[in-house]
A protein has these predicted regions:
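Canonical Rossmann dinucleotide-binding motif of NAD(H)/NADP(H)-dependent dehydrogenases/reductases
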Residues: 2-40
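Short C-terminal tail/terminal secondary-structure segment
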Residues: 248-249, 260-273
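Substrate-binding pocket helix/loop in short-chain dehydrogenase/reductase
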Residues: 110-111, 115-123, 229
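Catalytic Tyr-x(3-8)-Lys segment
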Residues: 220-243
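Catalytic loop of short-chain dehydrogenase/reductase
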Residues: 151-179, 184-193, 205-206
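Short, small/polar-rich loop/turn modules that mediate ligand/substrate recognition or access, typified
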Residues: 192, 197, 259-261
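The beta1-alpha1 cofactor-binding region of Rossmann-like NAD(H)/NADP(H)-dependent oxidoreductases
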Residues: 52-53, 73-85, 116, 241-243
Length: 273
């Protein structure tokens, strides 16, 4: 018996990294998964995004944990496409209990100051995409009528301004992740009458393909500004996906049944540096 037996969870950005970690962990606790990812590159994002093969691997790992999964190829920036994909998952698995809005992009290392298309892409994915995820999923939780849990993945950069270098990329990332915290607080109030809890996790840099790619690594190497430092604790360069997943598991579990409207930094002290 798991803590989440027979729950249905929607996870965006599920093809790899944190999203895959969350999907597998929830499945191991008994949840069925609607796994959403764009499975395509975005022209303005300078590193490779997840592929359909990545999403298939996530699905295989959920199935290996003994749970059902519906892989959905959808872009969180496209509300109609996201709603259609989520509905396909609902048709197969039933109404939703848990939502993890994890899809996000970053472009550390892009030093352009007036790159408006890049700024727009980051905000549209990280913030508008999280809002779209609420619109596509929360009505199902309400229909089910037994409450639920929503976790929006923000960042330690959603709580502080460290890392700002004047670039459009970093302005957009910090602004979008601060926006996710505001979205969470508003949603926690709006959905409380339906017994839906809404919280954020706020990781610092996580050892996933979003950070561990040539573009971002080279950018951080060329700009060793201490403001980009990700952690305070010694010998911790990046946190691991599993560290974030443990926080997510707690937030969506009955152990956090009275927890709503909070931010949970998983950052090895980044926000207090």
């Amino acid at each position: 018996m798991g803590e989440l037996d027979n729950a249905v969870a929607v996870i965006t950005g599920a093809a790899r990294g944190q999203g895959r970690s969350h999907a597998v962990a929830l499945a191991e606790q008994g949840a069925d998964i609607i796994a959403v990812d764009i499975c395509a590159d975005i022209d303005t994002i300078p590193y490779p995004l997840a592929t359909k093969s990545d999403l298939d691997t996530t699905a295989e790992r959920v199935q290996a944990a003994g749970r059902k999964v519906v892989p959905v190829v959808a872009d969180v920036r496209d509300l109609a496409g996201l709603e259609a994909g989520v509905q396909a998952g609902i048709d197969a698995l039933g109404e939703i209990d848990i939502v993890i809005a994890n899809a996000g992009v970053v472009a550390i290392g892009d030093t352009q100051t007036r790159a408006e298309p890049l700024f727009t892409t980051i905000v549209d994915t990280n913030l508008t995409g999280a809002w779209h995820t609420l619109l596509a999923t929360v009505p199902s939780i309400i229909r089910k009528g037994r409450g639920g849990s929503v976790v929006l993945v923000s960042s330690s950069q959603g709580l502080i301004g460290r890392g700002g270098d004047g670039s459009a990329a970093m302005f957009a990332y910090a602004a979008s992740k601060h926006g996710v915290v505001g979205l969470m607080r508003s949603a926690a109030n709006a959905y409380a009458p339906h017994k839906i809890r809404v919280n954020t996790v706020n990781p610092s840099g996580v050892a996933t393909p979003m950070i561990l790619n040539d573009f971002v690594i080279n950018g951080m190497t060329e700009n060793p500004n201490p403001a980009v430092a990700q952690t305070l604790l010694p010998d911790v360069a990046l946190v691991e996906s599993q560290d974030v997943t443990e926080a997510v598991l707690w937030l969506v579990s009955p152990r956090a049944r009275y927890v709503t409207g909070i931010t949970v930094p998983v950052d090895a002290g980044h926000v207090v540096m």
